[in-house]
Amino acid sequence: MSFTPGKQSSSRASSGNRSGNGILKWADQSDQSRNVQTRGRRAQPKQTATSQQPSGGNVVPYYSWFSGITQFQKGKEFEFAEGQGVPIAPGVPATEAKGYWYRHNRRSFKTADGNQRQLLPRWYFYYLGTGPHAKDQYGTDIDGVFWVASNQADVNTPADILDRDPSSDEAIPTRFPPGTVLPQGYYIEGSGRSAPNSRSTSRASSRASSAGSRSRADSGNRTPTSGVTPDMADQIASLVLAKLGKDATKPQQVTKQTAKEIRQKILNKPRQKRSPNKQCTVQQCFGKRGPNQNFGGGEMLKLGTSDPQFPILAELAPTAGAFFFGSRLELAKVQNLSGNLDEPQKDVYELRYNGAIRFDSTLSGFETIMKVLNENLNAYQQQDGMMNMSPKPQRQRGQKNGQGENDNISVAAPKSRVQQNKSRELTAEDISLLKKMDEPYTEDTSEI
C-alpha cells in the first residue's frame, strides 16, 4: 500500500503518467504517444528543484510535494529540532513522516548596474527514498541535505510515498505541526517573511506550485527552460530598485534629518503603538526607567527593538487575543494634562491590564531568554546605585575648575618674602636703621 500526500492511499499502478514498464515520464520529457501541442505552444511544468544536468539533455526535475523554504538572511543555518521538520500532509501517517530537506542553490543574475547578484538558496522536502538523494541512507552526512523524521517513523526503511506527478498533483503549501520551531532567517514560500518568527503552526496558506499555472513558451523560438522561473520575482525587484537608484543589498544611509523625521513619526503614534529604535530611543518613546517601567538597560535602552537580543524576547510577547482574553482589564478615566487651557478638554481613559506570560525550560532559547531578562529587569536600580556610589563632584558657584580641590598639593616656594606677602617682627638692627633715617641730614665739613 502506497500513500499519496493530500489524498487517500492508493496503489502505485494508479499513476496516470507512467508507461507500461513503470518508468515515470516527466512532463517536459518527449513522449510521442501524447500530443501536448496547443496552438503552437507547449505547456511546461514549474520546476521546484533540479538535479545534475546530463550532457545533451534537458534538466531532469525532482518534484517536491511541498512548497519551498527560502533563505533571506545570510549566515543563518537551516536546521530543525529532533522530531520536527516534516511538513504536514493529509493522507500520510506519522510512520511515513521521514525524509530530508534539499538545498537548491539558485543561480546568480546581472543587475541593471552590471553587478552580479547571487540569490540565496531555497530548500525543498523529499520523502525518504525519493528525490535527488533517493539512494542515500538516513543520516548520511551530505552537504546541502538536512535529515528530518517524526518520532514514530522508522528511518531504516524508505517511505512508502508515491512520486509527485506535476500534471495531476499540485504542490502542498508547507506547514508544520504546532510547536515546530522554524529556522531563523528563512520564510516559507507564500507565507510572508514573518513566518520564521512564529513558533506556532506556520501559516503557509499560500500559492501552491500548480500544474495548471504553466509557463508558456514559443515552441519554435524558445528552449524548454525559457519560461517563468521561481527566481524571476527577485530579479524584477532588483531591477526596479536599480532603476530607482537604490541597492537592495546596501543599507540606506540615515542622516540627521532623516533620523529626526523617523523619530517624529514614531512619537506621533499613540504610546502603545510606538517601537523604539536607534533613531528614537526607549526613553524618548516611554520616558525614564523606574518602578512602573522597569525593563531595559545598557545597549537595549539605546537600540530599542534594533537590539540583536530583542527578537528572542519578542517570542514571549502575547498576541492581541491573549492580551484581551488572558489579562485582567480595567478602564479608568484620568486627568487630561495635554493641550492649552483655551482648547476644549478631551476625556482621557486608560485601559489598565494585569497578566502573566508563562514559559518553562523546554522553550527554545530558554537560557538566552533568562540571561537577557536578568540583565534588563530593574536595571535602572543598578545604574542609580552606581551613580550614588561615585557622584560627580559639584563645583561651587563662582569657583574655577580645580580651585579648592587639592589643598595638600605642594607647590614651589616663592623666591622672596615679599612674594609670599608675609609680615614679620622688626629686629633691633632694623629699629636702629629706622632711627638713623629719621635724623636730619648734616653735611660733613671736616677736613682730611
Curated annotation (Swiss-Prot):
> Where would I find the CoV N NTD domain in this sequence?
61-190
**Which GO terms label this protein's molecular function in UniProt?**
RNA binding
Q: Name one GO cellular component term.
A: ribonucleoprotein complex
Q: Where are stretches of biased composition, namely Polar residues?
A: 29-38, 45-55, 399-409
Q: Which InterPro entries match?
A: N_prot_C_CoV (IPR044344), N_prot_N_CoV (IPR044345), NCAP_bCoV (IPR043505), Nucleocap_CoV (IPR001218), Nucleocapsid_C (IPR037179), Nucleocapsid_N (IPR037195)
Domain CoV N CTD: from-to ranges: 259-384
Chief subcellular location equals virion
Q: What job does this protein perform?
A: Packages the positive strand viral genome RNA into a helical ribonucleocapsid (RNP) and plays a fundamental role during virion assembly through its interactions with the viral genome and membrane protein M. Plays an important role in enhancing the efficiency of subgenomic viral RNA transcription as well as viral replication.
Homology family: Belongs to the betacoronavirus nucleocapsid protein family.
By what name is this protein known? Nucleoprotein
